[in-house]
């Protein structure tokens, strides 16, 4: 497993390659088993999302996952936002698996940069998924150990190092059925800066890749793992974001998502709960 920190030129090449794959998927979205949506910003009382616990959309169109009171983040906060329509990640009849690309931008800001906690994650889970434990479990796990019944795949952006399962320092991680990541890379979190994230899953190679770019700082981070989603996830899933703040006093941060898009293709799929047949429409500002 190689991890990299890129400067300007390599950041551009990384984004170019991810964008190319994104465009390949766009060319396929008219096939039967496809799902596509874009939120350039969010709307208050957003009908296309399921909000859990503290998550809400602000009057300025920001998806605020964890609680903020008078401009100050709250401790012991947990919030999740899921796309409203279930998503067929694989087809039990054909055995085919969906490829997908998702991109989103977020800001994590902390009153005290030395005491951040706990993090934000993009995840896929069973359709009936509910918020789980606070703090280091990021709202998506009940305990820190591998359990195949969890049926969860996540990419985490972890701002607090839990000594029982995390590497030292802030990091990105890929999680499969456990808060103990199968892969991690160091992440130089930038307080209050916009982070652009690109996550792709290529079904033919079972390759899950995530990159994070800070345009203002000209730095990027990338992580990759082989994940067989057909072995890990149920045929139908929900997906979205989860975030938590710390348990202890002072260990807090904002967890704000600014925009989000998603494209997928399931070859030969014939029953995908797409935006249209879920009774929803793609939202645009």
Swiss-Prot record:
Signal peptide start-end: 1-31
Tissue expression remark: Expressed in seed.
GO molecular function per UniProt: carbohydrate binding; metal ion binding
Positions annotated with a glycan in the UniProt record: 147
Gene3D superfamilies registered for this protein in UniProt: 2.60.120.200
Highest taxon of source: Eukaryota
InterPro entries, alphabetized: ConA-like_dom_sf, L-lectin, Lectin_LegA_CS, Lectin_legB_Mn/Ca_BS, Legume_lectin_dom, Leguminous_Lectin
Keyword Manganese: yes
Residue runs in coiled coils: none
Residues involved in Mn(2+) binding: 156, 158, 166, 171
Residue numbers binding Ca(2+): 158, 162, 166
CDD domains (UniProt xref): lectin_legume_LecRK_Arcelin_ConA (cd06899)
Post-translational modification: Mostly found in non-glycosylated form.
Record keywords: Calcium, Glycoprotein, Lectin, Manganese, Metal-binding, Signal
Family per similarity comment: Belongs to the leguminous lectin family.
Subunit text: Homotetramer.
Known role: Seed lectin.
Protein name according to UniProt: Seed agglutinin 2
Organism whose genome encodes this protein: Robinia pseudoacacia
Upper taxonomic lineage: Eukaryota, Viridiplantae, Streptophyta, Embryophyta, Tracheophyta
